[in-house]
């Protein structure tokens, strides 16, 4: 059987919730990766990752041999989302990250692209599904040259 291939570009963030209490590393990009790996898809994942977040993703990939390729743009510290409860509006501490946009040009690939806090991703692909992840001022996909 042929494995479906998809590229995901998205955030990997630390999520802290008070009630119920949890402290996990996910974010929209990493959550999508976990879901698609569980469905048997082969995934190329592009994200801004701290050393700690990269180690967590590599541990998750261990359960799915040959399904996940991780392309890291390194950052010093992960962004943290603090929630009082799971459906609450998160508090995101101020942060300053000076990074360049992630560039991916794979015209034969399908992409799932999430807006990220660190920087935009510039994507050229066959089919692209884009979720800007911004409730107040979402950017159009083409605004950054994608």
Which functions belong to the PLM regions below?
Residues 17-28:
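A short, glycine/small-residue-rich beta-strand->loop->alpha-helix junction that serves as a flexible
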Residues 2-13, 24-25, 47-53, 58-146:
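Ribokinase/PfkB-type carbohydrate-kinase core domain
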Residues 27-38:
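Histidine-anchored nucleotide/phosphate-binding helix
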Residues 41:
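Short phosphate-binding/catalytic loops that engage adenosine nucleotides
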Residues 44:
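Conserved beta-strand positions in the Rossmann-like core of class I SAM-dependent methyltransferases
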Residues 14-15, 31:
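Short, electropositive, low-hydrophobicity segments enriched in small/polar residues
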